[in-house]
Amino acid sequence: MRFLIGLLRQTWAGLLVLLALTAVLGVLYPAAVWGVGRIGAGAAEGSPVRDTTGCVVGSRWVGVDPQVPAGDPDPFFHNRVTGSVAAQDPFAPGDPAGALPTNQGPSSEILAAFVTQRRNAIAAREGVQPESVPADAVTGSGSGIDPHISPAYAALQVPRVAHVNGLSESRVRQLVDENTEGRQLGFLGEQRVNVLELNLALGLTVPRCTAPTAGG
């Protein structure tokens, strides 16, 4: 009899532990993780950037350089070069799905030649001397898909963007200032400009759009 009572007590204790762990690990913990994730719902969904109609035009964390047909006026602010293609083509837009930093080091003659080509091409596009082109305009980032450019590179593009879009340079500079982010925590990194959000502020988006879902 004592054995049976002891067995029942142990079984009951085991069931209580099972129910408690099921409630904590199977319900409360997943609910807490879901709730924390919803605090930054946009970030959890890829930080999509939408235009005024609600269409997704990109992600604020993925830099995709706008492409303009050769010979057409260029109204866009442009990103940094995509690192994944730096060893093949100095001007290729690249594919964010497979973006990686370039494996070309500072002593690479290929990288040096590409940097020179990019500097000359950007100088011609912006109507400035090659030595005026900032370093981030001709080099890829560590990720290869940096969505930001330096305020210096944004300022270099202001006259062209203002002219093509029929805006005053002061108005475009104001938009650049409004889309310039400060250092993280006040001391980490440098000031930076999100290119996608800046182009969107100008009313410019890439010619594609993902319609919002019924719940989005």
Regions found by a protein language model. Name each.
Residues M1-A13:
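Cytosolic-side transmembrane helix boundary signature
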Residues W12-A32:
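Hydrophobic membrane-insertion alpha-helices, especially the h-region
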Residues A154-G216:
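Extracytoplasmic/periplasmic C-terminal soluble domains
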Residues R9, L21, E181-Q184:
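Short, flexible coil/turn micro-motifs enriched in small/turn-prone residues
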Residues L19, I110, Q191-N194:
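Basic, gly/Ser/Thr/Pro-rich low-complexity segments located predominantly at protein N termini
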Residues I5, G26, V33, G37-Q157, ...:
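Flexible, solvent-exposed loop/hinge segments and secondary-structure transition points
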